[in-house]
């Protein structure tokens, strides 16, 4: 058995707080002396070297780690989300179709199917917009700004990307004008 594997077997029971009986019942054979020999040096390390006990590390609550989960259904009811998202996507479809008549872009094509809006701008790239019902968001993939997730903001009456505070319509207007050379009014 490799040295690293033996080291892990000696240290693992202490970190997992497993008794030798429990380990044997799971098919792992470890002698009590081996466990005791590995525990004593670790106890000294945790008490003296770091002033932190091992049990404080293994019983730490992970609820404080990372962002809190959001119950999106409480933010926007599903029926209201679909109504707002469908209206927005259909509105964008109509406006961008009209815009396509005014710009000379090889490969310009807009398609809406399976609740996904796809705008192809030939060699300039492709936009994809779709609903994410569980999150109550509209997701956009842009050849300019990359992926964005827009939440409905009741106060602003707009879809907002929380990371940058960008509004969906405004962001699309700016990017399409820069890419295609013609202004567009989406709002």
Curated annotation (Swiss-Prot):
Gene Ontology annotations of biological process type: aerobic respiration; embryo development ending in seed dormancy; heme biosynthetic process; intracellular iron ion homeostasis; iron ion transport; iron-sulfur cluster assembly; regulation of iron-sulfur cluster assembly; response to hydrogen peroxide
Enzyme class of the recorded protein, top EC level: oxidoreductase
UniProt-listed Enzyme Commission number(s): 1.16.3.1
Keywords: Heme biosynthesis, Ion transport, Iron, Iron storage, Iron transport, Mitochondrion, Oxidoreductase, Transit peptide, Transport
Subcellular localization, as worded in the UniProt entry: Mitochondrion
GO MF annotation: an example: ferric iron binding
Catalytic activity: 4 Fe(2+) + O2 + 4 H(+) = 4 Fe(3+) + 2 H2O
Matching Pfam families: Frataxin_Cyay (PF01491)
Family annotation (InterPro entries): Frataxin, Frataxin/CyaY, Frataxin/CyaY_sf, Frataxin_CS
Gene Ontology cellular component annotations, sorted alphabetically: chloroplast; cytosol; mitochondrion
Main location per the UniProt record: mitochondrion
SMART domains, sorted: Frataxin_Cyay
Superkingdom in the source lineage: Eukaryota
Residues that span the membrane, as ranges: none
Described purpose of this protein according to its UniProt entry: Promotes the biosynthesis of heme as well as the assembly and repair of iron-sulfur clusters by delivering Fe(2+) to proteins involved in these pathways. May play a role in the protection against iron-catalyzed oxidative stress through its ability to catalyze the oxidation of Fe(2+) to Fe(3+). May be able to store large amounts of the metal in the form of a ferrihydrite mineral by oligomerization. Binds to the mitochondrial cysteine desulfurase NIFS1 and increases its activity.
PANTHER family: FRATAXIN, FRATAXIN, MITOCHONDRIAL
Family in the record: Belongs to the frataxin family.
Quaternary structure annotation from Swiss-Prot or TrEMBL: Monomer. Oligomer. Interacts with NIFS1.
Protein name as catalogued: Frataxin, mitochondrial
Naturally occurring in which organism (per UniProt): Arabidopsis thaliana
Gene name of the encoded protein: FH
């Amino acid at each position: 058995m490799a040295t690293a594997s033996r080291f892990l077997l000696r240290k693992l029971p202490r970190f997992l707080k497993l008794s030798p009986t429990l380990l044997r019942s799971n098919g792992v054979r470890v002698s009590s002396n081996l466990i005791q020999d590995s525990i004593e040096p670790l106890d000294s390390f945790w008490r003296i070297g770091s002033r932190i006990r091992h049990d404080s590390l293994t019983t730490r609550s992970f609820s404080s780690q990372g962002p809190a989960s959001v119950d999106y259904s409480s933010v926007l009811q599903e029926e209201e989300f679909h109504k707002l998202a469908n209206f927005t996507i259909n509105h964008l479809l109509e406006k961008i179709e009209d815009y396509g008549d005014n710009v000379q872009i090889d490969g310009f094509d807009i398609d809406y199917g399976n609740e996904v809006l796809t705008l192809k701008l030939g060699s300039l790239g492709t936009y994809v917009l779709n609903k994410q019902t569980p999150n109550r968001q509209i997701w956009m993939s842009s050849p300019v700004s990359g992926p964005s997730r827009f939440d409905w903001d009741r106060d602003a009456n707009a879809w907002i990307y929380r990371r940058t505070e960008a509004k969906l319509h405004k962001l699309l207007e700016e990017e399409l004008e820069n890419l295609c050379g013609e202004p567009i009014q989406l709002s």
